[in-house]
């Protein structure tokens, strides 16, 4: 596993996590 794929995986995780936080925030939780 090279550094490029590792960086992409981390970026997708952070993006998904922040997106879910925004959705939760707008839901009023």
Swiss-Prot record:
One Gene Ontology term of the molecular function aspect: electron transporter, transferring electrons within cytochrome b6/f complex of photosystem II activity
Keywords annotated in UniProt: Chloroplast, Electron transport, Membrane, Photosynthesis, Plastid, Thylakoid, Transmembrane, Transmembrane helix, Transport
Database matches in SUPFAM superfamilies: PetN subunit of the cytochrome b6f complex
Role description: Component of the cytochrome b6-f complex, which mediates electron transfer between photosystem II (PSII) and photosystem I (PSI), cyclic electron flow around PSI, and state transitions.
Protein name: Cytochrome b6-f complex subunit 8
Subunit and partners: The 4 large subunits of the cytochrome b6-f complex are cytochrome b6, subunit IV (17 kDa polypeptide, PetD), cytochrome f and the Rieske protein, while the 4 small subunits are PetG, PetL, PetM and PetN. The complex functions as a dimer.
Entry's transmembrane regions: 3-23
Major location (coarse): plastid
Protein topology in the membrane: Single-pass membrane protein
GO biological process terms on file: cytochrome complex assembly; photosynthesis
Annotated family: Belongs to the PetN family.
Localisation: Plastid, Chloroplast thylakoid membrane
Gene that produces this protein: petN
GO cellular component, one term: cytochrome b6f complex
